[in-house]
Amino acid sequence: DDDGKFLPKISDFQGMYFKDADPIIIKTLKDSGRMVASGTVTHSYPFCWRSQSPLMYRAVDTWFIKVTDIKQDLLKNNEDPRWVPSFVQEKRFKNWLTDARDWCFSRNRYWGNPIPIWASDDMEEIVCVGSIKELQELTGSKDITDLHRENIDHLTIPSKKGKGVLRRIPEVFDCWFESGSMPYAQSHYPFSINDEQFMKGFPANFIAEGLDQTRGWFYTLMVISTAVKGCAPFKNLIVNGIVLAEDGTKMSKSKKNYPDPLYITKSYGADACRLYLCNSPVVRAESLQFKETGVKSVVREIFLPWFNAYRFLIQNISRYEAQNGKNFVYDPSMVASLNESSNLMDRWIISATQNLI
């Protein structure tokens, strides 16, 4: 059942938590002479990411969006935006769209936005409500202002097929459906603005997220936009890689397998961390194993030489001003004269700056 306990039809173990039943099941098999083999096997197993308690996969009734019907439209719309780097669009995301399956958008939990579907007990009559106004008209309730489930689950819709009343299904939306609906929800479209106003800011000029969002936000944005508007939801997209712990595993607050960002900032400065990330595989949508020593080396190999060069410049400006009795002022004409200089060091400096350009 929903609590992980065996149902009454499993008479020998009814009401027992599935993990607590393991040793009893083994003993029952042994006592009945039906045990073929018993031992310990090491294998992957699902655990709750919060409580770390063992999980059991169980088939439940869910609601799906038939993504397979619009797969070709998804592939076509994927060709329009500009992706940086481009290989994510051409390989990873395209492959994900090519193998797209129907999307299970419902979740069996309490917290979440309620799916606005009312159905008869036999599921043969279904109504999907499109607005508060429509819900008021269908239910006859005029004081609907809050759409959280505790405020609408009691509302019923009279059946048009003689099936009594329709009740809201118990499921709520997958949070990724909500993320993919962001372009419309942020402006309360189509209720607060019309099509013309909406299209002034759609598709988005630019979005950015991590590589893992090819299966998350990028995907749900594209599916909903293709279904609702027939086009891609963005014009330009920048993808960054994933920053991992030093040992190559996912960063985890519970495992504390990464240095505190505030410690890094306080010890080495925010700019050192920024430059470390800017000069890493992350900007090429590749993974980075974050190392504190990497940030430290940026300070030692880049920022300290920069600071020493700056200090050398300031010291010589101060000496120049003291010797000449006037302020040092940048003179663009001096650059032109340096280009014609016969001094080898001057010519090297000009050459180095041209290489930078």
Annotated model-derived regions:
Residues 1-4, 109-111, 119-121, 129-287:
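Alpha-helical recognition segments enriched in aromatics with Gly/Pro capping
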Residues 1-129, 133, 147, 217, ...:
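Residue patterns forming the tRNA-binding/recognition surfaces of aminoacyl-tRNA synthetases
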Residues 19, 322, 328, 340-343:
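Intrinsic disorder/low-complexity signature
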Residues 72-75, 193-195, 245-247, 329-333:
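Short hydrophobic/aromatic-rich motifs at helix boundaries and adjacent loops
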Residues 113, 237, 314-336:
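Short, glycine/acidic-rich hinge or "gate" loops at secondary-structure transitions
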